[in-house]
Amino acid sequence: MAHPYYPAGNPRFNHVAMSLPADLLGEESRSDICSFFEEVLGFEEMAVMTEDRRRLILSCVHWDQFIFLISEDDPMKCPQMDHYGFAVNSLDDLKGIQQRAEAFRKKDDRLKLIDLHMDDQGVVKIHSLYVSHILPMTCEVQYWEFPENPKPYVPAATAG
C-alpha cells in the first residue's frame, strides 16, 4: 500500500553530495576517484557535467542516481564511519564488490575496506561491507536476506 503522502509510489534517494578541496577534483585525483568507482562499483563519470577542479558527478549505474562532488574552500570533514549506503539484490553481487575492492586495494592502498559481515536480526540477515577511497564519506553496501522461516528477534541483553 502506498503512503498517503506519496500515492504515485514511495520516494527514493537519488543522490549524495560531498564537498572536496579543488585539488581533489583536478585531473589526476579525479581520474583516481573515477577509477575506484568504475572498477569497484561500476559507477561512471558523467563527463559532460565535469568541470576541472570544480565538479564531478558519478552515475550510480542509472543516470538519476548519482554522487555529486563539488569543490569548496572549506570542504566536508567527517569521521570514517559517517557513510551513505547502497543496496544490491544478491549476496553474490555483494561478494563481487568485496572481490573487486580487494583487487583495487592491491594497486592503491588508499582504499579502506571493512570486510563483508552479517547482522542476523532473526527476520532479516543484513549482509554488508564498507569501502572508502579518497572521499570524506565511506560507502556501505548491503544485501538484505529474508529467511523463509525467520527466527524471532531477541534484543541483546544489556549489561547492568
Write out the residue ranges for each language-model feature.
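Vicinal oxygen chelate
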Residues: 1-26, 76-160
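A short, hydrophobic/aromatic-rich structural module that often spans a beta strand
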Residues: 46, 52-87, 93, 156
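A short, terminal or domain-edge coil/loop segment
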Residues: 63-74, 96-112
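Short, well-ordered turn and helix-capping elements at secondary-structure junctions
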Residues: 20-22, 71-73, 117
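Secondary-structure boundary/capping residues
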Residues: 25, 46, 93, 110-111
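Core segments of cupin and vicinal oxygen chelate
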Residues: 18-66
